[in-house]
Amino acid sequence: MKQLLDFIPLILFFITYKLGGVREAAIVLVVATILQIVILKWKYGMVEKQQKIMASAVVFFGLLTAYFNEIRYLQWKVTIINGLFAIVLLVAQFQFKTPLIKKLLGKELQLPEKAWNTLNFGWAIFFIICMLVNIYISHNMSEEAWVDFKSFGIIGMTVIATIISGVYIYRYLPKDGSNSKDGEK
């Protein structure tokens, strides 16, 4: 339910854009995002920090898009958010020696430190790729192509990155059913 709720604003944005246009789609996106946060708070008692940041960015850039009737503000949001995610992951790993992926998944998975660093770096590269592809599409293709990319392309890229991460993690999982604390083979 929670994951489905994350996609509702995007789906409504896509449909409204195809039926109405940029301004209408941006307004629907902002309203749906605010409702999503209200529902999450009501149903689960809290909203995760990452969701608050994303919702704030959607509301800010969505309102700019609606006010100016110009999609470039939402295009900037995708670029900025992906860039920030990459920077945060890289700074945490190289400056503070703490792979954030480990903080997110460390309770569920026991992996060697090298694996956490590789995963963290891989996701940082993924966000950089998303940022660069977004810049390319938003500057060199039609508005409709960008909306399609935003609605489906990034999701597809995320699924591929998740599968690659899963395959990478699999090699560190215990083979005999034991629960190895350090995740070493």
Curated annotation (Swiss-Prot):
Q: Which UniProt keywords apply?
A: Cell inner membrane, Cell membrane, Membrane, Transmembrane, Transmembrane helix
Q: Which GO terms describe its cellular component?
A: plasma membrane
InterPro entries the record matches: YciB
Q: Where in the cell is it found?
A: Cell inner membrane
How is it placed in the membrane, per its record?
Multi-pass membrane protein
Task: Show the HAMAP family listed in the entry.
Answer: YciB
Family named by the database record? Belongs to the YciB family.
The record's listing under PANTHER family reads: INNER MEMBRANE-SPANNING PROTEIN YCIB, INTRACELLULAR SEPTATION PROTEIN A-RELATED
The protein's name in its UniProt record: Inner membrane-spanning protein YciB
